[in-house]
């Protein structure tokens, strides 16, 4: 987010629990990382590894807390590039399918931190 972005209901300015955060800026106790067996490098070599990690952490009973007090600059996909070749697209598709299968039950329940009255079809937080 841009530093001046307020987000929905000014949520960019408050600490809050989320289902997942990006591994580009992520911190946890080593013991928690080890307890959930870290990143799944076998099934999620590039995509979804951070979300999978967060899902495992939540399943173990911990919270994923986002804070506005940490700031980092992250240029998504600069080092790895985009999914612009058939091989990369196939890898991404495989990782997406593996994620959907692994977390099917949790995904069907919906995001506990997203208001179920708001649409998932657009990013404007309009009423469903």
Where are these regions (language model features)?
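Conserved active-site-proximal loop/helix segments of enzymes involved in bacterial cell-wall
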Residues: 75-78
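C-terminal, non-catalytic tails of nucleotide-sugar-dependent glycosyltransferases
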Residues: 1-18, 22, 27, 64, ...
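A short, conserved alpha-helix in the catalytic core of glycosyltransferases
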Residues: 13-37, 42-73
